Swiss-Prot record:
Active site: H22 (proton donor)
GO MF, one example: L-rhamnose mutarotase activity
Function according to Swiss-Prot or TrEMBL: Involved in the anomeric conversion of L-rhamnose.
Any single Gene Ontology cellular-component annotation: cytoplasm
Lineage: Bacteria, Pseudomonadati, Pseudomonadota, Betaproteobacteria, Burkholderiales
Listed EC numbers: 5.1.3.32
Subunit structure comment from the entry: Homodimer.
Protein name: L-rhamnose mutarotase
Species per Swiss-Prot/TrEMBL record: Paraburkholderia xenovorans (strain LB400)
Length: 107
């Protein structure tokens, strides 16, 4: 298992809508993420910067790189494009975050 984190940016004033949409996440999208090896996916919000900080655990043999080819993933990104920063194809703009500390890794 591997943990990764990344940052995205939510448009100002869209926190409640972002939370509402995720509270009603499509079951077929949940299945696609699970089938790709994604586990324990969490997203945090910084109200001062409008940044979203995502963290997830994935299997070592994950297939996350195939998610952008799935219709359900593309439709979800289209659905979310009006409330967050995205590329022209509606892929969310993401900045990978580097780990700098992990308490469990201490001996």
């Amino acid at each position: 298992m591997e943990t990764i984190a990344f940052r995205m940016v939510l448009n100002p004033g869209m926190r409640e809508e972002y939370e509402r949409r995720h509270a009603q996440i499509w079951p077929e999208l949940v299945d696609a993420l699970h089938n790709a090896g994604v586990r324990d996916y969490r997203i945090f919000f910084d109200p001062d910067s409008h940044h979203l900080f995502a963290m997830l655990t994935r299997h070592n043999h994950h297939t996350m790189n195939e998610l952008p080819q799935l219709d359900v993933m593309r439709k979800w990104w289209d659905y979310m494009a009006d409330i967050m920063q995205t590329a022209a194809d509606h892929t969310p703009l993401q900045q990978p975050l580097e780990p700098v500390f992990h308490l469990n890794s201490l001996s």
